[in-house]
C-alpha cells in the first residue's frame, strides 16, 4: 500500500494553467474510473477548486510519472508544461499534505473553512464512482478528524481575513440577531456576491441588491433568495435597511447625507450599520457624522483583516503541530494494520492445528484412554505442530547466515538470553 498526492495550486500554477487542469463536476466520476483503470491505482479521489486540482491515490507501487502523464493527456496538455507546475507528495508527506489542505493551512486565504467542505465533496464523489476503498477511506476520515481538531483547538478560523467576511462580522457585533435584520447591498460584483453569501448563511431576514442594471442585480439576487432593484430605488429601500454594504465602480458617491437623514427619520432613528468597500467611496463621508449611523470604510476593514491575519498566522503554528501529530498517528495505525492479515492467517492456522489435536484427544478418551496421558499427548502434539514451521524456517535462516532475521525472531517470540535452558557443561 502506498499513498500519493499530486496536483497544482495557486502557488505553483497560473490562473490559465489552473483553468485548463480543472475538472467540472460532470467529469469527475468518469475521470476517476479512467484514472484507476489506466494508472494501476487501486483507489483514487479528485479535489478540484478554483485554486487547486489534486489527485489522491493509493497504489501497490507508487507511479507518479504515470499519474502525471494521465493528467496531462486527460486535459490535453504537454507533460513538460504540467510538470513545471505540479507537485508530488508520497506516503507520510501525502497524508500530511491532505490534512494541511483540509485544515486551510495551504489555502490562498489562511484558515478558510470552505476547503473542508470541498474535500468532503471530493470524498463523496469518489465513493459514488466506486474508487474509494478501505485505505483511502480511512485516510479521508483521519483527514476530516484532523481538520476538525484544528478548528476546535486553535483560533485559525475565528477571525475574518476577507473584506466581505470582515464586513459581515462587524454587522454581527452591532446586531445581536442578524435573523431579524434587513440588508441593502449596493453593487453586484465579486465582493458584494461574497457579502450576500455570508449574510445569507447568517440567516438575514431580507436582502435587497441594488445595481445600475437590473439584470445583473437579478442574477445575484436569485442565488440567495434576495430582491433586485435599481440604484434609483435606494432611497425607498434605505428606510427598511438595518445593514447597508456598498461596493461599486462608480466614480461619484451613490449615497449622500440627505438621503440617509431622511431614512433615519422614517426609521425613528433606529441605527443603520454601513460599510463602504468601494474605492472611490460610494457613501459620502459626511454620512458618518450622523448619530445613528455606524459607517466603516474599506480602510477600517483592512485594519481588521490585517490584525486578524496576524492572529491566524500565530494560530497556524499550533495547527501545523496538530496536523503533524495526526499524520504520524495515521501512519502508525496504518503500519499496525499491515500486520492484521498475517495475524489473521496465523490464528486460523493455529486454530486448525488445535482442532486436529483436540479431535485426536477426544477419540483416545472415547476409546478408554487415561485422561492424564491423553492431556499430556494433546499438549505435546499441539506444541510440536505449532513449533514445526518456525523451527524449519529458523534453521534455514541460520544456515543462510541471516543473523538479522534470527534477532528479529527472538524479539518476535519475546525471548532473551536467560530464557533458554543451557546444556550441562
UniProtKB/Swiss-Prot annotation:
It comes from the Bacteria. The record marks 97 as: Important for activity. Its EC number is 1.2.1.70. The keyword Kinase does not apply. It catalyses: (S)-4-amino-5-oxopentanoate + tRNA(Glu) + NADP(+) = L-glutamyl-tRNA(Glu) + NADPH + H(+). Substrate binds at residues 49-52, 107, 112-114, 118. The active site is at 50 (nucleophile). The keyword NADP applies. NADP(+) binds at residues 187-192. Keywords: NADP, Oxidoreductase, Porphyrin biosynthesis. One of its GO terms (molecular function) is glutamyl-tRNA reductase activity. Pathway: Porphyrin-containing compound metabolism; protoporphyrin-IX biosynthesis; 5-aminolevulinate from L-glutamyl-tRNA(Glu): step 1/2. GO terms for biological process: protoporphyrinogen IX biosynthetic process from glutamate. InterPro entries: 4pyrrol_synth_GluRdtase, 4pyrrol_synth_GluRdtase_dimer, 4pyrrol_synth_GluRdtase_N, GluRdtase_CS, GluRdtase_dimer_dom_sf, GluRdtase_N_sf, NAD(P)-bd_dom_sf, Shikm_DH/Glu-tRNA_Rdtase. Belongs to the glutamyl-tRNA reductase family. Possesses an unusual extended V-shaped dimeric structure with each monomer consisting of three distinct domains arranged along a curved 'spinal' alpha-helix. The N-terminal catalytic domain specifically recognizes the glutamate moiety of the substrate. The second domain is the NADPH-binding domain, and the third C-terminal domain is responsible for dimerization. Catalyzes the NADPH-dependent reduction of glutamyl-tRNA(Glu) to glutamate 1-semialdehyde (GSA). During catalysis, the active site Cys acts as a nucleophile attacking the alpha-carbonyl group of tRNA-bound glutamate with the formation of a thioester intermediate between enzyme and glutamate, and the concomitant release of tRNA(Glu). The thioester intermediate is finally reduced by direct hydride transfer from NADPH, to form the product GSA. NCBIfam families: hemA. This is Glutamyl-tRNA reductase. It comes from Pseudomonas putida (strain ATCC 47054 / DSM 6125 / CFBP 8728 / NCIMB 11950 / KT2440). The lineage of its organism: Bacteria, Pseudomonadati, Pseudomonadota, Gammaproteobacteria, Pseudomonadales.
